[in-house]
Amino acid sequence: MTQDELKALVAQAAADYVLANVPEGAVLGVGTGSTANLFIDAMAPHKARFAGAVSSSEASTRRLQGHGFTVLDLNEVDAIPVYVDGADEIDASGAMIKGGGGALTREKIVASVASVFVCIADGSKLVETMGAFPLPVEVVPMARAAVARQLAALGGQPRLRMTKEGQIYKTDNGNVIIDVVGLRIADPKGLESVVNEIPGVVTVGLFAKRGANVLLLGTEAGVQRRDF
């Protein structure tokens, strides 16, 4: 199967998980990216069953609304039973690198409210040690040079994210992203704490302190489920 076919497979598996485990009238938490988009599409026929969804990005909001979902502000919501999102990398403990799509801060906020984080990914995303995928760090613009120096001191090579048009990439929150390459992340929780303490960092795309509870992994043999 192609990577796109594997993504579609796990997206449908996530929809099946939600339908089996989330009560009617609940609010869904929805992530960002190509796999999350397929999950949104798979849930579209069942939108009337739920009170609405909390989205982690403007892009996901547009896709949800295009399917007729009610998109709620997180401040209006008391509880989210399940948050479904993809990952750029995930290890055997359920820790993840996220933020390749630029929505890491809102993803981390929505995930923190959810009772269960369901990660959906194709088999290539499961790794022994994270760091091959560049680690995204959302940064207040005025602090980007200072933060980059501190990230370099940690052993990484910081690179300011740019758009295809050559402009500085801006998040939905108006901040910039520094992608750090060359890291071998042996202690995800420790590195998450260290980077988040750098003044000017909004958040780092390490989801270790609040990792996945369930992984639905698309493989040639079908969808494998892992619980953490």
Swiss-Prot record:
GO BP term, pick one: D-ribose metabolic process
**A GO CC term attached to the entry:** cytosol
The alphabetical list of record keywords is: Isomerase
Give the residues annotated as active site.
Answer: E107
Sorted alphabetically, which Pfam families does this protein's record hold?
Rib_5-P_isom_A
Q: Which reaction does it catalyse?
A: aldehydo-D-ribose 5-phosphate = D-ribulose 5-phosphate
Gene3D superfamilies named in the record = 3.30.70.260, 3.40.50.1360
Binding partners and assembly: Homodimer.
The similarity comment for this entry is: Belongs to the ribose 5-phosphate isomerase family.
Q: Which NCBIfam families match?
A: PRK00702.1, rpiA
**Name by which UniProt lists this protein:** Ribose-5-phosphate isomerase A
